[in-house]
Amino acid sequence: MKYRKEKLERLARVAHLYYEEDKTQGEIAEILRVSRPLVSRMLNEARSIGIVEIRVRSLTSEPEPLSELLCQTYGLRSGIVVPDEESEDVTHYAMAQRLLAYIYEQQPAVVGIGWGTVIGLAAKRLEGIQVPSLAIQTICPLLGNSNVLSRQYHSDEHVRMFAEACGAQPVFLHAPVYTASEADANMFRETAQYQAVVDQWKKLDLAVAEIHDDSIIQRTGYCGQVNAVGYAAGYGMDAAGKMLSLPHTVMRIPLDMLKQCRRIIGICTADTSIQALQSVLRAGLITDVLAPESVAQQLVSKTQ
């Protein structure tokens, strides 16, 4: 079929908005003033004529020596290593797919979700689909929402998208990650909504948290800490892995409840520093790690 230049440009724009600007199909429909089903058809058409090319990798194969070394060195239950792609963005998409496979393998009943790049991509991949045969009953956030516009830093939004796809019950926090004062934080903690999330935190089977370095402070206005080199699930750690106390104004799962969780997977993106990953691993905060192969290689080389 021969396509007019205008149609090719329109298909390319839809593909760009969806795959590169992280827009949902609903958001694209609003931008272009068309129906959401039409956006879906246009994305399929863009793939069929070669505007979009997607490569599929095995979701269960990781470079075994690296995975084993990570587990042996840091006492992990699993070290999930994803081969690097041609760009960080494509690598992060592959990591998001592997994260979804990991969640499926665990079959948890209660899941806690943080925020970040890979978690946001995983939530997006679930948009508009139904995931079969999952044991998940409830999904809740691990920490409050960032005040930036980017959806990848809004844990309540991730909870909504995961819950819709899995047929699970969402429990929202409806609170910022960092409140203006201790009085504001206490006000949130007294609400019925906060107590409903606490009830789920006590029953967590799986916690999904991204690992961040100091760049998270610039991106989200997150409350940084002196001597902290790594952050995960609302907690900061120094280079030796010592947990640092955050102000009482930070809205996140209490540490004692987090440590009672059966599995805690820490996700290290391609642009997160090795020092941040090391600090979280040394703290013993996570039971599993998901990382790009290049990051895992650097980490192993520093510990040998």
Model-inferred region functions:
Residues 118-132, 217-228:
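Short Gly/Thr/Asp-enriched flexible loops that form oxyanion-binding sites at enzyme active sites
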Residues 2-5, 41-112, 123-135, 147-154:
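HTH-adjacent hinge/linker in prokaryotic transcriptional regulators
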Residues 83, 112-118, 269, 293:
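Glycine-rich beta-strand-to-loop/alpha-helix junction loops that act as flexible
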Residues 2-15, 20-33, 38-44, 50-57, ...:
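Conserved phosphate- and dinucleotide-binding cores of soluble alpha/beta proteins
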Residues 106-110, 134-136, 204, 261, ...:
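A general structural motif
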Residues 26, 94-111, 117-119, 202-219:
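N-terminal glycine-rich phosphate/adenylate-binding segment common to multiple enzyme folds
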Residues 79-80, 140, 171:
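General small-molecule cofactor/ligand-binding pocket signal
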Residues 138-145:
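Catalytic or ion-translocation cores adjacent to nucleophile or general acid/base/metal-coordination motifs
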